[in-house]
């Protein structure tokens, strides 16, 4: 019973860390990375379609993304979708290939992005603590129903705390890497 609670908590904590990593991928650093455009959708045959389903996105060099559109008619729509996004990018079209040069980040913008990244990391920590609270509540319920002893309760809470500490530590490591990436000129 306790092992199931711990396993569930650990899986949920790992998912929270992965979700944070995915959220941070969408925050632009100075380098071009295809995942930067992963949140962009294009109007295609009356439905919003993710960019990666209508085009191929690759990093041409450290400052340029190249988008190869599968359907030539979509080039204008893809270009418009990128301009309408809040990424502040100006795509240039050349037939079926759209090049997106990434302007260098200003110091002020870097600091703003670091604040955003820290906020995302804090949201991740809050999610981890909520998972800990849920797991501890489940263990307390077992104790209340006299299915486990107080010693088992204490031991389970200590183990859940260790899982929490490990998850928070990995969030802090992800945050440190992203901050370093952002502050590199």
Curated annotation (Swiss-Prot):
Example of a GO MF term: ribosomal large subunit binding
Keywords: Cytoplasm, Protein biosynthesis
GO CC term, one of those recorded: cytosol
GO BP term (any one): cytoplasmic translational termination
UniProt keyword annotation of Lipoprotein present: no
Disulfide bridges in this chain: none
Chief localization: cytoplasm
Record flagged with keyword Cell membrane: no
Matching InterPro entries: Ribosome_recyc_fac, Ribosome_recyc_fac_dom, RRF_sf
Annotated localization: Cytoplasm
Family statement drawn from the similarity comment of this UniProt entry: Belongs to the RRF family.
Purpose: Responsible for the release of ribosomes from messenger RNA at the termination of protein biosynthesis. May increase the efficiency of translation by recycling ribosomes from one round of translation to another.
Protein known as: Ribosome-recycling factor
Annotated gene: frr
